[in-house]
Amino acid sequence: MSTPKAEPVPIPGPRGVPLMGNILDIESEIPLRSLEMMADTYGPIYRLTTFGFSRCMISSHELAAEVFDEERFTKKIMAGLSELRHGIHDGLFTAHMGEENWEIAHRVLMPAFGPLNIQNMFDEMHDIATQLVMKWARQGPKQKIMVTDDFTRLTLDTIALCAMGTRFNSFYSEEMHPFVDAMVGMLKTAGDRSRRPGLVNNLPTTENNKYWEDIDYLRNLCKELVDTRKKNPTDKKDLLNALINGRDPKTGKGMSYDSIIDNMITFLIAGHETTSGSLSFAFYNMLKNPQAYQKAQEEVDRVIGRRRITVEDLQKLPYITAVMRETLRLTPTAPAIAVGPHPTKNHEDPVTLGNGKYVLGKDEPCALLLGKIQRDPKVYGPDAEEFKPERMLDEHFNKLPKHAWKPFGNGMRACIGRPFAWQEALLVIAMLLQNFNFQMDDPSYNIQLKQTLTIKPNHFYMRAALREGLDAVHLGSALSASSSEHADHAAGHGKAGAAKKGADLKPMHVYYGSNTGTCEAFARRLADDATSYGYSAEVESLDSAKDSIPKNGPVVFITASYEGQPPDNAAHFFEWLSALKGDKPLDGVNYAVFGCGHHDWQTTFYRIPKEVNRLVGENGANRLCEIGLADTANADIVTDFDTWGETSFWPAVAAKFGSNTQGSQKSSTFRVEVSSGHRATTLGLQLQEGLVVENTLLTQAGVPAKRTIRFKLPTDTQYKCGDYLAILPVNPSTVVRKVMSRFDLPWDAVLRIEKASPSSSKHISIPMDTQVSAYDLFATYVELSQPASKRDLAVLADAAAVDPETQAELQAIASDPARFAEISQKRISVLDLLLQYPSINLAIGDFVAMLPPMRVRQYSISSSPLVDPTECSITFSVLKAPSLAALTKEDEYLGVASTYLSELRSGERVQLSVRPSHTGFKPPTELSTPMIMACAGSGLAPFRGFVMDRAEKIRGRRSSGSMPEQPAKAILYAGCRTQGKDDIHADELAEWEKIGAVEVRRAYSRPSDGSKGTHVQDLMMEDKKELIDLFESGARIYVCGTPGVGNAVRDSIKSMFLERREEIRRIAKEKGEPVSDDDEETAFEKFLDDMKTKERYTTDIFA
């Protein structure tokens, strides 16, 4: 019985402008991003029109499965591919259906890509891959690797050698082969030309002239290769011989000279461009997901070990195969396919999709957004956006519905070079994981795209360190060894220990795991101290210690715990450490651990440092001293760290290795020359520049100020709802002026900072050996408001020797726990103490040395990329309060970052970067999932983004008829003081409420009518029946705010849970069913842990 036809509905889409249509809705640099955003807004199908030409964009598996039916639809050459026909005419990828040259070439070339021929290319693939391995081995672990560039060299040289017997020798030149520049130029310009009217493309512009020059270069190069082969024939069964000598088994015809050139260019481009992108994405995914990286490397170790890889090994790497499948699912490097109604087989009039729901125009093509189709949650589940290779192992991959994975195209027009690309990718990944440990150059890097007609990561750098037992000198011969020689070599050549940095200094290694810079600052602080104890300390990220923890001196691990997870630059180390096996593999290591955490994350408080401390010890290492811990919720973490170092770590090092203290002499840390009349700014950052578009005050007088800032993001930067924006701030000018005044510096003073001696601190985060404006130094490089530590007090006391009364006072504060606690509680900084005690005679060099480096601050993004992916907003409170350390009543305590942000104006530039949320703190993919959001004050920020995202989806999908009348309920509980004064974003939320995106329930703690105030937890308890019903129907709960808000909401949820639990227990007892014996606290904690695991209860708590 056939399904009744659906009622046709209009195909939705953005409104265009006259003549140009939707051309302005499509980004010029990364068109894919805007096309996918429109799919999120308008649903599984939408229509675009440019210059009178329309096409439908498809983003769901259900509709894609229809148009992949080759009885109804066939490949359509349009947009950028149509423009490429100027260069490669009717080659395999650009031919229209029915063109004779395509049919001949397809039948001639298919045998060249048969399994045996591909396997016979293995040795040549291995030869080029060896060149890549040796380049990275010789560069060493400090070298930043531009991943896409070197993978481009690899794949271009591989296709040239294997398919055409030609060596481009790309690894022997700093510059890319001219073929690459011409290819990129042609592909990019073809895409640009496809978005312009034909008249403009015929104008003699610089870009158009370069386009034709690139085409000429590519064709002439291939003509030269063909002519050389014809003059020097060979029996090699490669692609070039097939092109020249092959005959069509159906017609007996050979390929024409022009067709040979067309397809040579096609294969040189297709044979390397997409594979280099896929390899780059694969390594990005593995480095972002340490567990997957660990499994892939363990598979290589288990299957291949240290011997030379063989072609037979590639069939025994199911996990690496899954990594590649999952990579191509998330980021198909050829991101779209165009189809149109089959001109001879499809007799529908009109042509429809969705069982008659969507009516296509006559001969209207459809473009399939493969990335969206392959991330369809109806096929891949709610975690469809996440990288999980396990879903692509054979047992799961083979059960996928038809057409759910299409990165190589469809049917007759699918990529015939797939076996070649697959063998090459598996070989390269296996060889690299066999020989190197990798880490991102910037662990906070999130994927950015570069698009021509294909996509690649942009600005993606990593570092490669040879694995334990390998060195560059012997690796070349080991790679060509036939069997066990590689393994024998590895066993015989261990890594050399770190060299001593001076005749009397012993080696020491300090590893840090840090996202915000606190633990890195501690690591450098400890390394600075090491010289005076007789050690030369190397400071590296924790990931650098993976696979090779040194045994030639003390090793210190300093790491934070972020919501129970390791920092970005410690994730691979932690994964490796957790998987260590064998009998005491870390025997001979002498270590200590210092950890940071935040007490509001009770269930995961200090989890990572404690686990590192336990696991390193359990694997045979010697623990030098007890773990040191600092709660970042307290202001005085520096003193906690210094105390641990002075009372635990350094005495333990002396006991184990002997004392080699080089002094307690009170010499200045820096020599400083002061001059004026110059201003120099030097700032080395791993952030990018954003532009302030708008800075708006959201509150009225009488309440703490809250603002929202809209930023224009750096090119290629992407974000998702729930992500953070990291900002590098500048100290308030009033605070900087206090420094200038205290040290009697004129406003234009210039400092030149040098090390006082060669053994002075090596780990400096300020400009050295160059002139820098004193104002810039104190404004941008250092933290001026950090509470003073006990060590700071000791330095100040020594500098107050001329005033015994002040000296005694400072010593008393340091030694009295109650008085010292006030330093943290009142946020009294070194600068505050210098102002309070003017007789302290502190050298400016010592003052600079006491200041920690400026760190970034993270703010929840309060916008949705569906509105504009090139912009994002933050919403924040401005911290401005009476100073508890004030010398006068007029003094105020100013939040460093919030003050800086509040003073920004439109057009000003800011150093920033997007940081992903490490939890499930993101809105549901589907509008059918209910939401409960609770916040107070600026905790509203991420929820504004969530609701904005829902509103855009609702508007788009309603216009397409692809969603029910009402989406699932989304309730927002928002705490504020007084209606009309600080109920921020009220107008926007009211508009979104009208379309059903949210229900806003405000709790006013200080109502204007003088009535009793309420808080979000009070409103939630009033609505408990509704909330329990929502939760039992699948709702997700989100909480954002201070610890007070988080704890209060948690208590409300606990109360509701226990009430509902008691009701369920009563009913069960009445039915004679068993009930749990857990006490109430245990039952609630189990429930909460389960909800967190399922990402149905997530929090974002800030100080």
UniProtKB/Swiss-Prot annotation:
Residues 685-924 form the FAD-binding FR-type domain. It catalyses: 2 oxidized [cytochrome P450] + NADPH = 2 reduced [cytochrome P450] + NADP(+) + H(+); an organic molecule + reduced [NADPH--hemoprotein reductase] + O2 = an alcohol + oxidized [NADPH--hemoprotein reductase] + H2O + H(+). Residues 492-1103 are annotated as: NADPH--P450 reductase. The keyword Chaperone does not apply. Residues 1-491 are annotated as: Cytochrome P450. GO terms for cellular component: cytosol. Keywords: Electron transport, FAD, Flavoprotein, FMN, Heme, Iron, Metal-binding, Monooxygenase, Multifunctional enzyme, NADP, Oxidoreductase, Transport. Its cofactor is heme; FAD; FMN. Signal peptide: none annotated. Induction: Induced by nitrogen limitation. Residues 508-649 form the Flavodoxin-like domain. CDD domains: bifunctional_CYPOR, CYP120A1. FMN binds at residues 514-519, 561-564, 596, 604. Heme binds at residue 415. The keyword Magnesium does not apply. It holds the Pfam family FAD_binding_1. It comes from the Eukaryota. Its EC number is 1.14.14.1, 1.6.2.4. The record marks 274 as: Important for catalytic activity. GO terms for molecular function: aromatase activity; flavin adenine dinucleotide binding; FMN binding; heme binding; iron ion binding; NADPH-hemoprotein reductase activity. In the N-terminal section; belongs to the cytochrome P450 family. Functions as a fatty acid monooxygenase. Also displays a NADPH-dependent reductase activity in the C-terminal domain, which allows electron transfer from NADPH to the heme iron of the cytochrome P450 N-terminal domain. This is Bifunctional cytochrome P450/NADPH--P450 reductase.
